[in-house]
Amino acid sequence: MAPLPTRPSARSRRLKFALAAVVLAIVGSSVTLLAVDVYLHRKFERSAGFNIWGYRGPAVGRKTADEYRVVMLGGSAAYGYGTNWDEAIPAVLERNLTGRAVGPFHRFTVVNLGYNNEGAYSFTFTLNDYLSLRYDLAVLYEGYNDLMGDPKAPNLSVFRHDSPVFRLTGYLPIFPIVFKEKAAAILTGTTASQYLSPSKTVFQRPIATKAAAEVLLVAARAGESLERQLGRITAEPARHIDDPDSAGCRYPWQQYCRSMIVAVDFALQHGAQVLVVTQPYGAGPTFKSRHSDQQSEMAKMLERRFSGNPRLRYVNFGDVVDLFDPQLSFDRMHLTTAGNQRVAAAFAQPVLEMAAQRASERQ
């Protein structure tokens, strides 16, 4: 007869119960938060948010044989800050190309991979993250977010990689952002208040209102706490820009140019074409002068490094939009719906020409 199993001690039972409770709490919280997050994605992905895979607009399906797929990378200008997803440049460009055909391509898809504050450093990460989209053309559309040109503090923002969940699964949670902004709006009447310094004075709301906001903040912090726990598993190396001087650009644009080189090289090595585009020149003499200088250095670098490569093209939209025109720009940087339409119209011909070049490769 086999010996009877030893009955666990009271202390052992308590420890196992505590462990089970912790596991169930984490799993239960995760399932609940996931359900909430999916709902919020559906609610906000067509306005100011992004879909479950971390890019703006509806998720695209499997690429078809007759499809020419474009991805547009950049900061808030590409993302379409201040407008709905279908008013941003990528969505307008896609509509403008509807019905056009170039060789074997009878369908054009433009995917918005931009995000607020992203600079050139983020491009290689984003191109790698979305290789599964099998894009034909990568549009690199950003200079504003690298205009500080500070070698000691370059723009190393890679928004999606701030999420351990995205790094591990490709799913990008949205509820911490939504809940924090809703709480800020409840307390101060504007989502921008969450970004103010602690010393900034804001009007106080009644106790009940503050309690409602606190519930939202607690929920957001719970999600962030779960992400931090997951972050221990998916930790990444510290972000930095390797060998910026090798770009050959004048100070202070070496890091910007180096990031552009790395991104272009990555796209070309993975079989994609690249369209590098200068944004409308900044408003005001200082902004415009600095932006023009940055883009001039970058354009000369592309010519030195990639001259003669038919899969790379540079175009300059510096004068396409006057950022002083309130009909085209609401803050002298970000574009209105009309401004986005004008830039999207300028994009159409270069994209069609790149598609024609791609078609010639297939012959």
Please annotate each region the language model reported:
Residues M1-V71, G82-N84, V102, Y121, ...:
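N-terminal secretory targeting modules
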Residues W53-Y115, T124-R134, A138-V139, N340-Q341:
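Serine-esterase "nucleophile elbow" of acetyl-processing enzymes
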Residues G80-A88, N117, Y121, A247-R258, ...:
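Soluble non-cytosolic domains of exported or imported proteins
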Residues A91, R95, Y121, F125-N128, ...:
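Solvent-exposed, polar/charged alpha-helical surfaces in well-ordered, non-transmembrane soluble domains
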Residues E94, T98-V102, N128-S132, G143, ...:
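Sec-exported extracytoplasmic/periplasmic mature domains
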Residues N112-G114, T278-Q279, N316-G318:
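Residue-level recognition of beta-strand->loop/alpha-helix junctions
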Residues N145-E303, D322-P326:
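Serine-dependent acyl-ester chemistry module
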Residues R239-A247, G282-Q363:
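Catalytic His-Asp segment of secreted/periplasmic serine-dependent ester chemistry enzymes
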